[in-house]
């Protein structure tokens, strides 16, 4: 796989607070190779390594997108959920930014059934058929639709398992990460100083709490996916 240039700037990462880690008491010793300094009780990640692994991740998603592969972005933290949704829309990816539905990937047949139901209900609503139901039945169906939309709305067009999953917070999204590991889906993950760098296929040392840091990392990945997709579209015209 040929390496490409993704305009990853250390000063930009410093400004976004990418290097800020957790307090030294909360660290994972496995993160030692990715930490550059300890200052006032806080660990700071080595941004040179962040740039290296972010570049590798961009290369991976670029080449995957250029071959028509599908991506899933997972970030269910309230403060970062909007960033994940924006990234998914921009890159035309699938997204889970509410509570992770247990077994979503490992029990894919059940998820498929629920997605079919969601799409059917959306079509029924658009056609105005829900309004023809009795009030009680209409209310029950609308509650079901709202629930499905909340938890599966970001993947409603997903017709198969994703090829690559991008996980923004290892601790918050451990269930999703574990499902990916179980069925062998490659993962890209942001890892703060309290994370395990060995779990994801590509781990990007970065602050996974600050919105500015999350957006910067996602922006780079989204740009790489979009670049890859444009090449795929041109090849298939």
Swiss-Prot record:
PROSITE patterns: RIBOSOMAL_S2_2. It comes from the Eukaryota. GO terms for cellular component: mitochondrial small ribosomal subunit; plastid. GO terms for molecular function: structural constituent of ribosome. It is found in: Plastid. InterPro entries: Ribosomal_uS2, Ribosomal_uS2_bac/mit/plastid, Ribosomal_uS2_CS, Ribosomal_uS2_flav_dom_sf. Its main location: plastid. GO terms for biological process: translation. Keywords: Plastid, Ribonucleoprotein, Ribosomal protein. Belongs to the universal ribosomal protein uS2 family. This is Small ribosomal subunit protein uS2c. It comes from Epifagus virginiana (Beechdrops). The gene is rps2.
């Amino acid at each position: 796989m040929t390496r490409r240039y993704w305009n990853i700037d250390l000063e930009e990462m410093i400004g976004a607070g990418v290097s800020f880690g957790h307090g030294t008491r909360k660290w994972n010793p496995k993160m030692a190779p990715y930490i550059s300094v300890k200052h006032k009780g806080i660990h700071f990640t080595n941004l040179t390594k962040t740039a290296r692994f972010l570049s590798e991740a961009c290369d991976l998603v670029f080449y995957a997108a250029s071959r028509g592969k599908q991506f899933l972005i997972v970030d269910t933290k309230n403060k970062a959920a909007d960033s994940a949704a924006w990234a998914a829309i921009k890159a035309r990816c699938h997204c889970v930014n509410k509570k992770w539905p247990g077994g979503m990937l490992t029990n894919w047949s059940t998820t498929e059934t629920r997605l079919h139901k969601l799409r059917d209900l959306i079509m029924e609503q658009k056609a105005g058929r829900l309004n023809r139901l009795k009030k009680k039945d209409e209310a029950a169906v609308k509650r079901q639709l709202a629930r499905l939309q909340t938890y599966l709305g970001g993947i409603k067009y997903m017709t198969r398992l994703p090829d690559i999953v991008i996980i923004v917070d290892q601790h918050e999204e451990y269930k999703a990460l574990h499902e990916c590991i179980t069925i062998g889906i490659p993962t890209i993950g942001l890892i703060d100083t309290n994370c395990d760098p060995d779990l994801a296929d590509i781990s990007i040392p970065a602050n996974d709490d600050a919105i500015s840091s999350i957006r910067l990392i996602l922006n780079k990945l989204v740009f790489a996916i979009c670049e890859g997709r444009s090449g795929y579209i041109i090849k298939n015209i």
